Amino acid sequence: MEALAVDGLPEIHEGDDLAALLEDRVDFADGDVLCVASTIVSKAEGRAFDRESFPPSDRAKAIADRLSTITGEQKDPRFAQAVLEESEELLTESPFLLSVTRFGHITVNAGIDRSNVPGADLLLLPEDPTASAERLSSALGVPVVVTDTSGRPFRYGQRGVAVGWAGLPAARDWRGETDRDGRELGVTVQAVVDELAATANLVAGEGDDGTPAVVVREWSFGDHDGSDLLFRREEDDIVREALRQWTFDGHQQ
């Protein structure tokens, strides 16, 4: 398997034909998977905004005031309003905003980016990343994973995750197959789109040296059952329920 950065992409603007820009730079082949950063998908889809686009509600002002008190830094209620508008639910309002996005992804600040947004203040995630992936996959003829960088519970550091995908299942189901000793596997479901996203993030890098698209070549899903169930169902998610019941005590570590 190879993971190859796509070099030479220009700064992306609203209305740019992302598929054409990628096709000009990559000779796609059977077995390729394109991993593309949500940032350039969002830019092409016009998801860059100024803070003034989000007049703050009373709730946003209260959130910003509380976060300012906790952190000792002035927080902008317009940013809090943007997070509220992009969230189906806020699982925590302090010491940070942990959002359930409208497409089911759970992440800090609804995944809103405040870096690498020339001419604007905020870059929102694609409105429907899987629909975005489907359009790119249809145009390019290869599976597509739309990636984002996200933190991890219980561990420091960030990694690439999938927020949308098309042309391949999200997960590979090993249940019912056997290990090397002949024992049947009962619980193993491999989140392949997340693993592809993490691979792409490792190759793409971050900051000024980063590239927003990576082609994973000669990787195969194999002869396994697949599933598109990536986001845990609410009724099965004990961590989500625990967060709803948790109250921040005012002491930031």
From Swiss-Prot:
It catalyses: oxidized coenzyme F420-0 + GTP + L-glutamate = oxidized coenzyme F420-1 + GDP + phosphate + H(+); oxidized coenzyme F420-1 + GTP + L-glutamate = oxidized coenzyme F420-2 + GDP + phosphate + H(+). GO terms for molecular function: coenzyme F420-0:L-glutamate ligase activity; coenzyme F420-1:gamma-L-glutamate ligase activity; GTP binding; metal ion binding. Keywords: GTP-binding, Ligase, Magnesium, Manganese, Metal-binding, Nucleotide-binding, Potassium. GTP binds at residues 9-12, 38-39, 43, 116, 204-211. A divalent metal cation 2 binds at T149, E206. Pathway: Cofactor biosynthesis; coenzyme F420 biosynthesis. The keyword Transcription does not apply. A divalent metal cation 1 binds at D113, D148. Binds 2 divalent metal cations per subunit. The ions could be magnesium and/or manganese. Its cofactor is Mg(2+); Mn(2+); K(+). Its EC number is 6.3.2.31, 6.3.2.34. One of its GO terms (biological process) is F420-0 metabolic process. It is an enzyme of class 6 (ligase). The keyword GTP-binding applies. It holds the Pfam family F420_ligase. Belongs to the CofE family. PANTHER family: COENZYME F420:L-GLUTAMATE LIGASE (PTHR47917:SF1), PTHR47917. Catalyzes the GTP-dependent successive addition of two or more gamma-linked L-glutamates to the L-lactyl phosphodiester of 7,8-didemethyl-8-hydroxy-5-deazariboflavin (F420-0) to form coenzyme F420-0-glutamyl-glutamate (F420-2) or polyglutamated F420 derivatives. Homodimer. This is Coenzyme F420:L-glutamate ligase. The lineage of its organism: Archaea, Methanobacteriati, Methanobacteriota, Stenosarchaea group, Halobacteria.
